[in-house]
């Protein structure tokens, strides 16, 4: 079993697309989909009810609290973290899971692309992503945890329970967990486009 855990804060306009992309994934193993509604004040919860997806409310606001809530409820051997404003390719779950099945791998992270809009052109984003990817390849050699983003992050569930997400920081809870997991094994950099997610430009500042 693989647990796919999404966190959502006021994502009523985007969460359906995210969950649709996950449901369209090609998997040859069972998965469970969990959504953590993190103190949303829009129609996120009503959409989750209509969709019939398993969800939990986390009233303590912040990605650390939300991701820890998801981890607490995950039943799978592997946990795949996603964000509700992001879409995933058809082989995303399979590709990330295969990375975790490699000997000694405790966690895996992938890359992502951006949707162009009025603020960021397709050409500008193309060159930004190329430069970022080169930087990530260099940084992975010594500090891979600094590359990790929760929307493209997967890990061994049992070991993650030993470490846990930090809830005392505004951001960086994903990299902090990766740093803790590094004590138990390798962090795998999944460069394949089969695991490359697509998200909005807000992640540029993350």
Question: Across the structure, where does each feature detected by a protein language model lie?
Answer:
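Short aromatic/hydrophobic "clamp" motif used to bind/position activated sugar donors
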Residues: 79
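Conserved donor NDP-sugar-binding/catalytic core segment of glycosyltransferases
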Residues: 91-122
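Acidic donor-binding loop at a coil-to-helix junction in glycosyltransferase catalytic cores
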Residues: 171-177
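Glycine-rich, basic loop-to-helix element that forms the pyrophosphate-binding segment
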Residues: 58-74
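Short, flexible, basic/aromatic active-site loop/helix in glycosyltransferases
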Residues: 110-116, 124-146
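Short, well-formed alpha-helical segments that are part of the catalytic scaffolds
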Residues: 10-24
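Acidic helix N-cap motif at the loop->helix transition within catalytic regions
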Residues: 14-16, 41-50, 91
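A conserved acidic beta->alpha catalytic loop
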Residues: 21, 37-45, 86
